[in-house]
């Protein structure tokens, strides 16, 4: 391997090297500093005169006299079944004090979106144990369903609760979680590690932690390392894998930082123009392949800057993914956990994974009726602020009280409370029973007579 000393310029995490030999895009580079330290980097861009190398560590110590070695290889993730139960850095190195991973394979981290023709339609219900997701915005195996949050909201707690509780009810197939955190503080990293170890969720998980003071370049490869691991577990070993990526906003900020260092022409709000394509290369790696046992389901979590759902990051994410779960500041102020607002939330694949043979025959109708009643009660709150509660009719007061009851009993649940889908639907019926039967216009009469608490008590009596 030849060594060159042709460093022309250093800008942030980028090293500009005068061209010396043909190099490939994404090729790995070893940079040897004057004191013999070897730093790793990757070819980001190349032209006739200059090669741009992004360094995975700090560029401190790199100078014109540093040696540059082009390896001729791209980044590969060493994978093996013994990765389960391990905590790795954002660059894929063990940080839990355990031994190095003995790889069964080394896989390219770029991966590829699943061929649309080879995709199988998602249809298996995943139970998260959270009523606002399971009951009204159901997650289906093979889906990509993001959580839209904002700074200061408990999205990390929601992510950990899903990682602990997610399962396919009644299934004996192996289930695993790949959890990748990007740009988090050391305090958050310690919190994540302690929770995974304390609750026993680590046994079936692989955890990647990229810290806020780690290089931005590493942040751009962390989700790809996580997805490569998930694809190996799913499509080689037959696991059903849930991938949780948090926080995608930090990932996009890293893209913007690197784009600025490369002096690229910025797009919306300074983010690179190719951010849509870049995000799609991550999100589209979820799915089920026909004839293959495993599956990859994704829950990317992002914080909306300024609580703005029209910001480029949630906006582009919404185009690519199949719905969204919206974490709400107003519910959080009321002390409700998880503060998930079901009204702007949506799961586009929900209807494929619910109903008879999946969850329960009344699931769709109960969900629709809960939505309708809560939406009406929520609208009436605005009216009360203007005319006062006394001006409302008796019917309106019922729906107003229903909205409060829905938030207090259906939305609110404990951090370690794992509700089955039956418990969630029964709770929905309990709340709907506070309304007159003639107001349950979205539920068929035979379902009311079968599941309404009034008729159930008669049947049991």
Curated annotation (Swiss-Prot):
It is a peripheral membrane protein. Belongs to the ATPase alpha/beta chains family. HAMAP family: ATP_synth_B_arch (MF_00310). One of its GO terms (biological process) is proton motive force-driven plasma membrane ATP synthesis. Component of the A-type ATP synthase that produces ATP from ADP in the presence of a proton gradient across the membrane. The B chain is a regulatory subunit. It is found in: Cell membrane. This is A-type ATP synthase subunit B. Signal peptide: none annotated. PANTHER family: V-TYPE PROTON ATPASE SUBUNIT B. The keyword Transport applies. GO terms for cellular component: plasma membrane; proton-transporting two-sector ATPase complex, catalytic domain. GO terms for molecular function: ATP binding; proton-transporting ATP synthase activity, rotational mechanism. It comes from Methanoculleus marisnigri (strain ATCC 35101 / DSM 1498 / JR1). SUPFAM superfamilies: C-terminal domain of alpha and beta subunits of F1 ATP synthase (SSF47917), P-loop containing nucleoside triphosphate hydrolases (SSF52540). Its main location: membrane. Gene3D superfamilies: 3.40.50.12240. Keywords: ATP synthesis, Cell membrane, Hydrogen ion transport, Ion transport, Membrane, Transport. Has multiple subunits with at least A(3), B(3), C, D, E, F, H, I and proteolipid K(x). It comes from the Archaea. CDD domains: ATP-synt_V_A-type_beta_C (cd18112), ATP-synt_V_A-type_beta_N (cd18118), V_A-ATPase_B (cd01135).
């Amino acid at each position: 391997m030849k060594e060159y000393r042709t460093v022309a310029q250093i800008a942030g995490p980028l090293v500009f090297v005068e061209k010396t030999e043909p190099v490939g895009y994404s090729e790995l580079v070893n940079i040897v500093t004057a004191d013999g330290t070897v730093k790793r980097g990757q070819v980001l861009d190349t032209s006739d005169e200059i090669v741009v190398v992004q360094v995975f560590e700090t560029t401190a110590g790199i100078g014109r006299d540093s040696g540059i070695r082009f390896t001729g290889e791209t980044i590969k993730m060493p994978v093996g079944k013994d990765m389960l139960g391990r905590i790795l850095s954002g660059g894929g190195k063990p940080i839990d004090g355990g031994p190095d991973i003995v790889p069964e394979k080394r896989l390219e981290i770029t991966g590829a979106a699943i061929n649309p023709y080879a995709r199988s339609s998602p249809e298996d219900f995943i139970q998260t144990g959270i009523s606002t997701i399971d009951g009204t915005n159901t997650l289906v195996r093979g889906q990509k369903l993001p959580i839209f949050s904002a700074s200061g909201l408990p999205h990390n707690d929601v992510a950990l609760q899903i990682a602990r509780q997610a399962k396919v009810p009644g299934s004996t197939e192996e289930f695993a979680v790949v959890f990748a955190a990007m740009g988090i503080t050391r305090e958050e990293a310690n919190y994540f590690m302690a929770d995974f170890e304390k609750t026993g969720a680590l046994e079936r998980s692989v955890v990647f932690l990229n810290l806020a003071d780690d290089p931005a370049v590493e942040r751009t490869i962390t989700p790809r390392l996580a997805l490569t691991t998930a694809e190996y577990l799913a499509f080689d070993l037959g696991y059903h894998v849930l991938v949780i990526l948090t926080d995608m906003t930090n990932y996009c900020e890293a893209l913007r930082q690197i784009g600025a260092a490369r002096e690229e022409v910025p797009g919306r709000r300074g983010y690179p123009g190719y951010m849509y394509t870049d995000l799609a290369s991550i999100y589209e790696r979820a799915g089920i392949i026909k004839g293959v046992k495993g599956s990859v389901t994704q829950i990317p979590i992002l914080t909306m800057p300024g609580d703005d759902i029209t910001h480029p990051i949630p906006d582009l994410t919404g185009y690519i993914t199949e719905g969204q779960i919206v974490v709400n500041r107003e519910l959080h102020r009321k002390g409700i956990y998880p503060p998930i607002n079901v009204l702007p939330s949506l799961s586009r694949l929900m209807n494929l994974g619910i109903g008879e043979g999946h969850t329960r025959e009344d699931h769709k109708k109960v969900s629709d009726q809960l939505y309708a009643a809560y939406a009406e009660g929520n609208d009436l709150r605005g009216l009360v602020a203007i005319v006062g509660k006394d001006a409302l009719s008796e019917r309106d007061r019922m729906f107003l009280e229903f909205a409060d009851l829905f938030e207090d009993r259906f939305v609110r649940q404990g951090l370690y409370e794992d509700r089955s889908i039956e418990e969630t639907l029964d709770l929905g019926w309990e709340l709907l029973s506070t309304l007159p039967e003639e107001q349950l216009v979205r539920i068929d009469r035979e379902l009311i007579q079968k599941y309404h608490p009034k008729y159930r008590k008669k049947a049991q009596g």
